[in-house]
Swiss-Prot record:
It comes from Albidiferax ferrireducens (strain ATCC BAA-621 / DSM 15236 / T118) (Rhodoferax ferrireducens). Belongs to the RbfA family. The gene is rbfA. Its main location: cytoplasm. It is found in: Cytoplasm. This is Ribosome-binding factor A. Keywords: Cytoplasm, Ribosome biogenesis. GO terms for biological process: maturation of SSU-rRNA.
Amino acid sequence: MRKKSKTPNRAFKVADQIQRDLTELIARELKDPRVGMVTIQAVEVTPDYAHAKVYFSLLAGDPKACTEGLNQAAGFLRAGLFKRLHIHTVPTLHFLFDQTTERAADMNALIARAVASRAKED
């Protein structure tokens, strides 16, 4: 009987560790004024560990400028990850603004309006 491949589980562990380390690196070592209060929401790593999509949200500020700042600092952050992670290949980082929280707020507003209009009708 063949053993199950542990690669997917390892990929999740690597992505989780990248998320934790990036959070610390951005908060403590990144000095770019365009990058404000950033929260790393998720990290998706390709099966060959060559690339990682890093989804982030922003408390305040311009998401476009923050994305530019993070993508320009990707090499610096990757070097910091290389010192912390003990894996052969540290992925190239691609930062993407996560609009999930904004969409959730918009959806909540739509639901609240629908409930309010239904209450007026009754």
